[in-house]
């Protein structure tokens, strides 16, 4: 697959995730229409808040803006036929599909954890597999973003070394610094989610003060 087709795949995945987030947003606003009658239960409401935020960030904005537009714009602005690592680019694109599927499955299983994955709230009251599906979905989305960022950084640096850096467009620098920030921050989120998964399923105490965790 060339970069244009992969950009289309990213855009389709992003639009799909955006529609999921939009439907969750409609449910939230529908719940606010009558202050004396709650259409949605409190636990499901918490999960919809969590799912809405994650869908808009990880499954709409990042695939469309970074994956979709990036795959179209970077080779065009750099004067290259494709990105430096096309197979890695295809792998990062196809990882979005199981990520979105796991997110969709988690919508119908269990309840959510509110605005954030606050570890005590995620471990004790919410013991269903819905939170685990959502964390696995975040793992896949983060892995896809890291692989795509590595591809962008490799492509941009190989182009910078072959031509004057003053001729590089500012949007290329924006993609470069965004990719560096993603590679720096996403492993921290992945480590925290992994520790939380171990606390929930394997009896560890990374986040449990009673067991020596912090």
Can you name each region flagged by the protein language model?
Residues 1-214:
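Membrane-embedded and interfacial regions of multi-pass energy-transducing membrane proteins
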């Amino acid at each position: 697959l060339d970069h244009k087709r992969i950009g289309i795949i990213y855009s389709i995945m992003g639009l799909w995730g955006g529609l999921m987030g939009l439907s969750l947003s409609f449910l939230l606003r529908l719940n606010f229409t009558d202050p004396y009658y709650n259409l949605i239960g409190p636990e499901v409401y918490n999960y919809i808040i969590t799912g809405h935020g994650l869908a808009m960030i990880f499954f709409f904005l990042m695939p469309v803006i970074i994956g979709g537009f990036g795959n179209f714009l970077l080779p065009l602005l750099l004067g290259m036929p494709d990105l430096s690592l096309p197979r890695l680019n295809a792998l990062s694109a196809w990882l979005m599909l199981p990520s979105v599927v796991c997110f969709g499955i988690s919508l119908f299983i269990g309840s959510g954890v509110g605005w954030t994955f606050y570890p005590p709230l995620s471990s004790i009251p919410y013991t269903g597999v819905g939170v685990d599906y959502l964390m696995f979905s975040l793992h896949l989305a983060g892995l896809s973003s890291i692989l795509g960022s590595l591809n962008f950084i490799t492509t941009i640096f190989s182009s910078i070394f072959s031509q004057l850096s003053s001729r590089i467009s500012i949007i290329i620098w924006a993609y470069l610094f965004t990719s560096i920030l993603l590679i720096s921050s996403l492993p921290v989120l992945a480590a925290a989610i992994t520790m939380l998964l171990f606390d929930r399923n394997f009896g560890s105490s990374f986040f449990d003060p009673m067991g020596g965790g912090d």
